[in-house]
């Protein structure tokens, strides 16, 4: 086995017959290996921890748009991070902080930033290229059309944005349909004018940054969108297409751009070029306008959750049951149900009730029979906010300090994957609803494996006309970057190897043939290595068994020139040989 080989072909012989795999597609328009950039992501399917799933699509309606709110402040200036994650189960530190009285020695960690939970990628800095790469890949998988950077506090986060631009451009040059970018600036006109000028000077000015021109979101116009106020500079004023931000607690102007909506069903905003726009958010802090008659921040609703009421009493706080219930339900958390008007932690974790009902507004308008009501653009809040600043009690004339926008996994609004109980369920729900909103259904014929017998000793031109599943080049890059929490060590991950960039599949009725191509030389197999060049297969008739939708794995066991096909246990371990492969390198 020589290191210079970049392609690996397999002949798989199984002890059973496969009808269809979860990621396969035939595209006759692709005639050569180098030319293949087939969007295999369209053909992937998934099932979340709660049994909800989505199917394959053949493409997207390009006259419909979905965007997501993206936050750049993690690690920018916070200092030590306090972790709120699972305070019910682990400790009561944060609750003690919020409930502490001045007479008890004050409220510690005032004005510090608190994480409501931990991302799958840790407490990362927003300029961590390894994390940005993962985010962009997830967005491409999801079919997102645009990303809105949050610069509403006046900062433009130049290093974070530049890193994001470079990686996004890299993937676009590989041939992937990448989401486009725009910025949201402050609702305050004067602050917005300064930000718009800085953003243009740092990222858009064609005299210096022309290479980024293809990355800006334009919709149906020839100008890049920006959410903000014209700064009064003729060049900049004429360069952008401007949308003013709609704040949820101000008078509604349906020509503005909504980042969140405190009405349900959500209001429809109108753009003269795009059409109808609706906000879809994971949760909504409507307690700030006393929607149910009681003022409450997210931390108030979280503190009054059923799991915490004993702790409130232990700190000497006594409230009537009616008041406790009212504060708990004053905000629309992840598990809020618009029918019963109540929150529920189990619904938040298992059903994403609020998020699903927000999407129901979009789908319902499409199904009402009046095409004038159809939604053309959905803006999702949000992806990766993660932190909120602890505010002092005296700032709100209240008995406790508080966190306004985020508190815990019930009262927060991030769809990014969590290390906690939420897992990747909100991301998968996002993908499912995007496909329902603008996906074009895939026919069963389009999902069939191409029928062709491959001679492993023959030339690679045998694979011409068989479309490949194109994967990202560069996604095995190493990670070594500081955490947003200065007290933590760097995040280090140097496990990446064998950067698979294309996988092709065919069969002749008896055997399945695979061609796997890597960006660089394939590393030699080392005895006992169970994770070398693994390929996982899911069979449409066996989705209830195996590991995360997959039932078989190739290459857990290699012996000489023969590798194995093995069943997967629920834990993801190889659990018995069912066939063999004959690998052949080129």
Predicted regions: what they are:
Residues 1-10:
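Bacterial N-terminal signal peptides that target proteins for export
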Residues 11-18:
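Alpha-helical transmembrane segments
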Residues 19-23:
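C-terminal motif of bacterial Sec signal peptides marking the signal peptidase cleavage site
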Residues 25-27:
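Bacterial signal peptide processing site
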Residues 29-455, 459, 467, 530, ...:
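Glycan-processing catalytic domains of CAZymes
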Residues 454-572:
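Surface-exposed, glycine/proline- and aromatic-rich loop segments on solvent-exposed faces
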């Amino acid at each position: 086995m020589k290191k210079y080989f970049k392609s690996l072909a397999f002949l798989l012989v199984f002890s059973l017959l496969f009808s269809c795999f979860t990621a396969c597609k035939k595209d006759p328009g692709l005639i050569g290996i180098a030319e293949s950039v087939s969007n295999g992501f369209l053909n992937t399917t998934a099932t979340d921890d709660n049994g909800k799933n989505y199917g394959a699509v053949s493409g997207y309606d390009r006259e419909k748009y979905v965007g997501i709110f993206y936050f750049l402040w993690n690690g920018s200036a916070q200092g030590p991070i306090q972790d709120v994650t699972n305070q019910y189960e682990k400790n009561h530190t944060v609750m003690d902080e919020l409930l502490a009285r001045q007479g008890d020695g004050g409220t510690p960690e005032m004005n510090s930033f608190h994480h409501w939970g931990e991302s799958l990628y840790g407490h990362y800095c927003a300029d961590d290229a390894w994390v940005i790469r993962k985010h962009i890949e997830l967005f491409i998988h999801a079919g997102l059309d645009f990303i809105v950077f949050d610069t509403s506090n006046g900062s433009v986060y130049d290093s974070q944005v530049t890193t994001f631009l470079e990686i996004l451009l890299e993937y676009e040059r590989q041939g992937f349909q990448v989401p486009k970018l725009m910025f949201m600036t402050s609702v305050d006109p004067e602050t917005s004018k300064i930000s718009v000028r800085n953003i243009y000077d740092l990222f858009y000015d064609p005299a210096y940054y022309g290479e980024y021109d293809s990355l800006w979101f334009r919709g149906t116009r020839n100008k890049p969108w920006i959410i903000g106020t014209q700064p009064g500079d003729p060049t900049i004023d004429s360069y952008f297409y401007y949308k003013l931000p709609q704040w949820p607690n101000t008078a509604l102007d349906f020509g503005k751009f909504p980042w969140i909506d405190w009405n349900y069903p959500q209001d429809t905003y109108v753009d003269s070029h795009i059409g109808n726009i609706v906000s879809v958010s994971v949760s909504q802090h409507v307690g700030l306008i006393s929607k149910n008659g009681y003022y409450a921040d997210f931390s108030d609703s979280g503190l009054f959750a059923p799991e915490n009421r004993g702790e409130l009493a232990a700190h000497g706080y006594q409230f009537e049951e009616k008041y406790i219930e009212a504060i708990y339900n004053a905000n629309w958390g992840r598990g809020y149900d618009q029918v019963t008007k109540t929150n529920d932690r189990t619904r938040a974790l298992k059903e994403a009730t609020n998020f699903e009902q927000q999407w129901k507004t979009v789908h319902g308008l499409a199904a009402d029979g009046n095409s004038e009501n159809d939604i053309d653009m959905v803006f999702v809040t949000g992806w990766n906010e993660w932190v909120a600043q602890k505010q002092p009690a005296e700032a709100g004339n209240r008995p406790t300090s508080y966190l306004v926008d985020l508190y815990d996994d019930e009262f927060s609004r991030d769809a990014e994957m969590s290390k906690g109980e939420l897992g990747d369920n909100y991301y998968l729900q996002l993908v499912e609803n995007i496909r329902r909103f603008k996906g074009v259904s895939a026919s069963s014929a389009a999902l069939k494996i191409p029928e062709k017998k491959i001679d492993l000793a023959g030339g690679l031109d045998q694979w011409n006309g068989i479309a490949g599943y194109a994967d990202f080049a560069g996604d095995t890059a190493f990670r070594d970057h500081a955490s947003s929490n200065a007290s933590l060590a760097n995040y280090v991950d140097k496990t990446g190897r064998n950067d698979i960039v294309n996988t092709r599949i065919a069969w002749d009725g008896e055997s399945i043939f695979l061609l796997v191509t890597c960006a660089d030389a394939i590393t030699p197999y080392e005895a006992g290595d169970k994770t070398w060049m693994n390929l996982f297969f899911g069979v449409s008739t066996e989705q209830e068994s195996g590991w995360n939708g997959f039932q078989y794995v190739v290459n857990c066991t290699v012996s000489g020139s023969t590798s194995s096909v093995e069943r997967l246990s629920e834990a993801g371990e190889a659990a018995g040989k069912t066939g063999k492969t004959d690998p052949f390198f080129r």
